[in-house]
């Protein structure tokens, strides 16, 4: 699907694909948003605007030169946008989707294969306040601003869930399986947010060095960059909190294991004396006079009980139990 935004008589209009198929129809184009574009759409846009649109393989490369490059006429940016639901426990719903931004002759081209609330919001803003968007750089700057705000909201929700998980550990509100699942989910989400923030910070840092963007755009991007730096630091704090929960979880497991081992150890030591007594009288030699005593059997049982109680009472006195 292709959304085309053109500027006419002080207004921004959303138009169809046919609006750029006539001669000189591209002069008023402000932004072309390609959502799940077909090969034919990509090819047509490349030809009519003389663009070198990166392939899917090029979009997913992680080296710096593949995430941002600039020539005399255009700027290409590939950056991560996180696709996730806050409460989702299905890891398949959690991933970073690469969005491509192309800036050429003050026109913004976006190529994306995922639906983001960011783009719905920016489209409404562009249509409602056309004076604030004179060229593609203004739109790109606003997209980054909106997206970083949404990343901040997502990070705040992650931090809230982290605090709840920590309280649950101390309150024994979770079983081990549930706790481990929630911990893994939050660690994964925090890592994905961090990757997304790092990628945007790298793109904006490079964009601030270009001479193609005007001063106002750079001022806005500088503010966004400061917010990004704060959020990156927050992800570090959140990751440390999650690591602390993991340490508490591991310590709790060790304590439970030690308690179990202690019980078995006490039981083993406690039953050693009666076992020894039973073994002695189980030999059944004729020369063992106790075997022929009338009270030999009950006395032996009493002796076994007493020999069991003595080590247990000793352990309690030493506060080992």
UniProtKB/Swiss-Prot annotation:
UniProt keyword list: Cell inner membrane, Cell membrane, Ion transport, Magnesium, Membrane, Transmembrane, Transmembrane helix, Transport
UniProt-annotated location(s): Cell inner membrane
A GO molecular-function descriptor: cobalt ion transmembrane transporter activity
Family annotation (Pfam families): CorA
Keyword Zinc: no
GO cellular component: plasma membrane
Membrane topology classification: Multi-pass membrane protein
Protein name: Magnesium transport protein CorA
GN (gene name): corA
């Amino acid at each position: 699907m292709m959304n085309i935004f053109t500027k006419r008589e002080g207004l921004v209009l959303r138009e169809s694909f046919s609006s750029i198929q006539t001669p000189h129809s591209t002069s008023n184009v402000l932004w072309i948003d390609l959502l799940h574009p077909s090969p034919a759409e990509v090819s047509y846009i490349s030809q009519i605007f003389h663009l070198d649109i990166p392939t899917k393989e090029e979009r997913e490369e992680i080296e710096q030169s593949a995430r941002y490059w600039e020539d005399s006429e255009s700027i290409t940016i590939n950056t991560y946008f996180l696709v996730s639901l806050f409460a989702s426990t299905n890891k398949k719903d959690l991933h970073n989707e690469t969005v491509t931004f192309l800036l050429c002759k003050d026109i913004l081209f976006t190529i994306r294969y995922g639906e983001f609330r960011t783009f719905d919001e920016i489209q409404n803003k562009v249509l409602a306040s056309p004076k604030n968007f004179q060229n593609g750089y203004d739109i790109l700057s606003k997209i980054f601003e909106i997206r970083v705000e949404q990343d901040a909201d997502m990070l705040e929700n992650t931090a809230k869930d982290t605090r709840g998980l920590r309280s649950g550990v101390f309150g024994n509100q979770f079983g081990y399986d549930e706790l481990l699942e929630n911990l893994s989910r939050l660690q994964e989400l925090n890592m994905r947010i961090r990757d997304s923030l790092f990628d945007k910070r790298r793109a904006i840092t490079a964009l601030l060095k270009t001479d193609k963007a005007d001063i106002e755009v750079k001022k806005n991007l500088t503010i966004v960059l400061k917010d990004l730096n704060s959020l990156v630091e927050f992800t570090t704090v959140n990751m440390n909190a999650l690591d602390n929960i993991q340490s508490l979880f591991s310590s709790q497991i060790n304590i439970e294991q030690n308690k179990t081992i202690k019980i078995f150890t006490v039981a083993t030591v406690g039953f050693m004396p009666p076992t020894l007594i039973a073994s002695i009288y189980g030999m059944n030699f004729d020369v063992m006079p106790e075997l022929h005593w009338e009270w030999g059997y009950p006395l032996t049982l009493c002796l076994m009980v007493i020999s069991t109680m003595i080590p247990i009472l000793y352990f309690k006195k030493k506060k080992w139990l």
